[in-house]
Amino acid sequence: MSIVHLQSVEILNAEASFKDPYVFKITFECISPLQDDLEWRLVYVGSAGDEKYDQELDTCMVGPVPVGVNSFEFEAAAPSPSKIPPEDLLGVTVILLTASYRDQEFIRVGYYVNNAYESEELRENPPEKVDLTQVRREVLVSKPRVTRFNIKWDDSATASASTQQQGSAEGLTA
């Protein structure tokens, strides 16, 4: 049984320039006191073919977490284009928002992100080198992919880290 229930994730700037930071409003409920902080991370998948291009955009610790409904804003810098293969700068990729307790990930929310030129002319006749000043990102907020992991919370032995539950956005507003 999870002690922390993610209620909603709002991406406050789902459509923005490629170089703009990502801004999230995260709301969750804590049903029992926690001894330690929660860690939230945002990861940008730079290339579907190789994890070495994944970039941790930011991480933040939230705590102490009181029992009840909690909300905070999480801002993470845009990915570093120099760490992304040039052929993967445009097109569809993924961002992953994760939450962990005591180094145990208990939830992961994945969103598709489409990076494309803003103008139709550039989309039809792209320059040889990608001009990121002309690229906009659009996060598909309507269909997040939510994966929940059972973990060991504080002194409870109710969970094992090897089990996981997957689903789309049941009960999660994006």
Swiss-Prot record:
UniProt organism field: Mycosarcoma maydis (Corn smut fungus)
This protein's name: Histone chaperone ASF1
Primary role: Histone chaperone that facilitates histone deposition and histone exchange and removal during nucleosome assembly and disassembly.
Subcellular localization, as worded in the UniProt entry: Nucleus
Family stated for the protein in its record: Belongs to the ASF1 family.
Keyword NADP: no
GO MF term set: acetyltransferase activator activity; histone binding
Region named Disordered: 155-174
GO cellular component, one term: chromatin
Gene from which this protein is expressed: ASF1
Subunit description: Interacts with histone H3 and histone H4.
Bias type Polar residues, positions: 157-168
InterPro entries on file: ASF1-like, ASF1-like_sf
One GO-annotated biological process of the protein: positive regulation of transcription elongation by RNA polymerase II
The organism's place on the tree of life at top rank: Eukaryota
Keywords from the named record: Chaperone, Chromatin regulator, Nucleus, Transcription, Transcription regulation
Chief localization: nucleus
